[in-house]
Swiss-Prot record:
Catalyzed reactions per annotation: a (2S)-flavan-4-one + 2-oxoglutarate + O2 = a (2R,3R)-dihydroflavonol + succinate + CO2
Enzyme class, spelled out: oxidoreductase
EC number: 1.14.11.9
Swiss-Prot/TrEMBL keywords: Dioxygenase, Flavonoid biosynthesis, Iron, Metal-binding, Oxidoreductase, Vitamin C
InterPro entries in the record: DIOX_N, IPNS-like_FE2OG_OXY, IPNS-like_sf, Oxoglu/Fe-dep_dioxygenase_dom, Plant_2OG-oxidoreductases
Protein name: Naringenin,2-oxoglutarate 3-dioxygenase
Annotated metabolic or biological route of this protein: Secondary metabolite biosynthesis; flavonoid biosynthesis
Family indicated by similarity: Belongs to the iron/ascorbate-dependent oxidoreductase family.
Cofactor(s) the record lists: Fe(2+); L-ascorbate
Superkingdom to which the source organism belongs: Eukaryota
Physiological role: Catalyzes the 3-beta-hydroxylation of 2S-flavanones to 2R,3R-dihydroflavonols which are intermediates in the biosynthesis of flavonols, anthocyanidins, catechins and proanthocyanidins in plants.
Cofactor annotation remark: Binds 1 Fe(2+) ion per subunit.
Any one Gene Ontology BP term: flavonoid biosynthetic process
Source organism: Callistephus chinensis
Length: 356
């Protein structure tokens, strides 16, 4: 299915509406019914007397949810304000301006409307602009927007500062696993960083769709900066129940990804989450994905006595990623087959009744 150039809700037929989710995938909790279950952790004193206390708080959050929020993280509030302001300015540009950086057709970085795996029938209600920032040699500035004018300078600084914060958090997680503090960073080899800016416009029927479908991130950790609207949701029971993460001004939401989950031998959860939308206001979030290099080996860094590895054998991160994508595609294919079969049965039943 080709990506659209703008988000348009088809009112006349929900069957033809490419944004309508199956009933079991639709939001169960409102975007603004906030939960306090996700801990908010102050990083003040992380390099001093509070390090052990902070480590304990992060460990508990990773074991319970794979998600926590951090404040007092040292990232300048002006940088956060500049980054979010420029992001909103970009999405308010005319469509043709944004489409100059269209990333369909396999282009690495740029702008796209909606998102979905190739082969999936349903799309997400969002626009995104993304760029690859680390390793520096992989940057392709031709794919970075040139409007607003300050975009490149601010996003470069933002990427650098968040790389530093991510490495600091990985040190704490390494120590929590009983390893040297550089262990997780070393396991990433030459750490990748990808920044995805999400814009979720108002939606006419938000109860039928998602801004971003349920998933876990493939990488090590993700740092999410979100506005105060609300819409990030998490589950820890396989999707039976959901909570909406309460936005905290200036905080980063930290999600543990699949790579971090495997390196911890399953001790730390990979955050199971989604984004919902609403009919009242747009929402903005900026996700910074910290991923291992494609050739990095994925396998538990420490297996305690009496435990077994949750992985059958080591694999590269690229192999892990491809396996994850193929599994997701196969699940989507099987679900679509079941849905099509059910629709066929619903057509046949009335015909059978006529001749009964």
């Amino acid at each position: 299915m080709a990506a659209p150039i703008s988000l348009k809700w088809e009112e006349h037929s929900l069957h033809e509406n490419k944004f309508v989710r199956d009933e079991d995938e639709r939001p169960k909790v409102p975007y603004n019914t906030f939960s306090n279950e996700i801990p908010v952790i102050s990083l003040a004193g992380i390099d001093g007397c509070r390090r052990a206390e902070i480590c304990d708080e992060i460990v508990k959050a990773c074991e319970d949810w794979g998600i926590f929020q951090v404040v007092d993280h040292g990232v300048d509030t002006k940088l956060l304000s500049d980054m979010t302001g420029l992001a909103r300015d970009f999405f308010h540009l005319p469509t043709q301006e944004k489409l100059r950086f269209d990333m369909t057709g396999g282009k690495k970085g740029g702008f796209i409307v909606s998102s979905h795996l190739q082969g999936e029938a349903v799309q997400d209600w969002r626009e995104i602009v993304t760029y690859f920032s680390y390793p520096i040699k992989a940057r392709d500035y031709s794919r970075w927007p040139d409007k607003p004018n300050e975009w490149r300078a601010v996003t470069e600084e933002y990427s650098k500062v968040l790389m530093g914060l991510a490495c600091k958090l990985l040190e704490v997680l390494s120590e929590a696993m009983g390893l040297e503090k550089e262990a997780l960073t070393k396991a990433c080899v030459d750490m990748d960083q990808k920044v995805v800016v999400n814009y979720y416009p108002k939606c006419p029927q938000p109860d039928l769709t998602l801004g971003l479908k349920r998933h876990t991130d493939p990488g090590t950790i993700t740092l999410l900066l979100q506005d105060q609207v609300g819409g990030l949701q998490a589950t820890r029971d396989g999707g039976e129940s959901w909570i909406t993460v309460k936005p905290v001004e200036g905080a980063f939401v930290v999600n543990l990804g699949d790579h971090g989950h495997y390196l911890s031998n399953g001790r730390f959860k990979n955050a199971d989450h989604q984004a919902v939308v609403n009919s009242s206001t747009s929402r903005l979030s900026i996700a910074t994905f910290q991923n291992p290099a494609p050739e990095a080996i994925v396998y538990p860094l420490k297996i305690n006595e009496g435990e077994k590895s949750i992985m059958e054998e080591p694999m590269t991160f690229m192999e892990m990623y491809k396996k994850k994508m193929s599994t997701d595609l196969e699940l989507a294919r099987l679900k679509k087959l079941a849905k099509d079969k059910q629709q066929d049965l619903e057509v046949v039943k009335p015909i059978q009744n006529i001749f009964a």
